[in-house]
Amino acid sequence: MAKNDKLGALGGFRLAIILVGALTLSNCAGKPGDGTNDPFETVNREIFDINMSLDKAILRPITQAYVDVVPDPIRDMVNNLLFHLKEPVTLASDILQGEWDRAGQTTARIVGNTVIGFGMWDVMGSSGAEGHKEDLGQALAVWGVPEGPYLVLPILGPSNIRDGAAELAQSLYDPVDFVTDTYLDYDTNFYVSGSRTVFTAIDKRAQVLGKLAELEKTSLDFYATIRSLYRQKRADEIRNGESGDAVPIPEITLELDEPMLSEPIAQTSKK
């Protein structure tokens, strides 16, 4: 108990530092004149090229094999489970934004899909309680925190200062990680979190497997296209709007889980 209390206090301090830092940097950034909000474009493009090279060399072939080998019903179950595991974050964001109707619906989904669907079948969605995604970045936007400059993060892809800080805070305070951290030993928890991270990346990549290649083929400036689509997508999500026929944003995303963040750098920096 003492250990958990100590970690909780340290985690709270880290969360405060992250969010205050994001707010400060976002406010100091100012508004760009060209509307792209990309003052770090030169560095961003270099990171983008590296990310795409990693995608083509590693993530895309793995995802293609996953799609080719794993039957659709199994992939649907994996997708449902990963979505289900993120719904506690959605619930917290719903509450932080004062969206009580959506919070109630998310609560019903968590309970119903856990008890009846075992997390792998969206029985509540079939009953009319459709799922939605919310995150801390959206809550900060509703609170008036500006997005700050556009960023391309190594491995993680398109982001900005506000959303990047929010994603880091979420990784430190993911409710599912809290449960596994409490009931599993460190090694088991690390492998469970790692598996979740890997399958999340593969599942997200599978959603845009053909679309990303087509988008790259038809874009005069692939980097600028992704930047524009990302910013449109985030603005739409903050408004709780529908994306309509917009092309989904290709993601090369590895969600950071706390056990992975706490692993010594010497052990995690090498691929």
Q: Each predicted region: which residue ranges?
A:
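Sec-dependent N-terminal signal peptides
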Residues: A16-A22
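Bacterial signal peptide processing site
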Residues: A29-G33
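Bacterial N-terminal signal peptides that target proteins for export
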Residues: A2-A16
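Mid-length scaffold segments of soluble, non-membrane domains
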Residues: H84-R162
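A structured, mid-to-C-terminal "fold-capping" secondary-structure block
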Residues: Q138, G144-K271
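C-terminal motif of bacterial Sec signal peptides marking the signal peptidase cleavage site
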Residues: T24-N27
